[in-house]
Amino acid sequence: MTTRLWDRAAVAVVADGRRFPAVAALGPGEPTVQELFDFMRDAELRFATLRMRILERVISTRGDDTTQIDVMLRHPGHARVTTSRPGEELGGTYEVWISDGDIVRTYAAQHKLGTQRPIRNRPRGLDDKDFPGMSRIYEPITGLPMETLPETFVHPAGFCQNVLATGRCQILGSRTVSGRSTIGLRCDHPRTVELPGDRPDHSMEISVDRDTGIIVRLVETIGGSLTRDAVATVLEPDASLPPSAFDYTFPTGTTMLF
């Protein structure tokens, strides 16, 4: 178990203008918490394309709610995230987020609303080496929608630094999730930005893919009761993607927001 803060989200290994994983692969044994975070930080550097499906189950006072999130990604810059209800008929309620690295397009089918906007520039100066580690952030090769499960799973550096490292972490050992070998980690009482979760009996467990460093499962409990279970049921690094994977035409009748 460790309570030492990890502040290496922004550490990058660069050679000839390219970034490389600082940790090429995990050893055969169990890593320490710090070693696991170092490995996770560079997850997206271990593949050129990615196909992933996440099923998220949220349990609250209003009952159970399940969401399906499909991700396609191609470095550098191209990403598509589709959020829907599992088993729903084609053309049902869904949301699409698509980026080519310069422009982000979104569409919400329920309200027939679309947007097309330039990617927001990140604040300047955050790469200043005089800044303490906790004040620096990971710069992704291919952006994903902020504060979403795809962002957390594929770009886990910020999650490790800003959430997991603020709690009491321990390695849980090897496990298999969706047919892939993973390392489990438990975090008790992590810092959160939402007051309902800022409790000493709030815990998180993650499963980290041994090959890529991607998070493939996230389980949250409060007071021993399950509140969220998100699992990557499909994970295909270096997947073959169709040429039209990142093409999108807004449906007829879309109202564009500016």
Predicted regions and their residues:
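Short glycine/proline-enriched turns and hinge-like loops at secondary-structure junctions
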Residues: G63-D65, G92, W97-I98, R180-S181, ...
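Short, solvent-exposed coil/turn segments at beta-strand boundaries
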Residues: L45-T49, V71-R80, W97-V104, R122, ...
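Gly/Pro-enriched, hydrophobic low-complexity segments
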Residues: P86-E88, A157-G158, N162-L257
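N-terminal leader/targeting segments and the immediate start of mature chains
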Residues: M1-H78, T115-R117, R122-I137, I141-P150, ...
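Short, charge-rich binding segments
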Residues: M72, G87-G91, E95-S99, A109
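Short amphipathic beta-strand/extended segments with alternating polar/hydrophobic composition
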Residues: T93-D100, L113-R124, D229-A232
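Short, conserved active-site entrance elements at the starts or edges of catalytic domains
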Residues: E151-A157
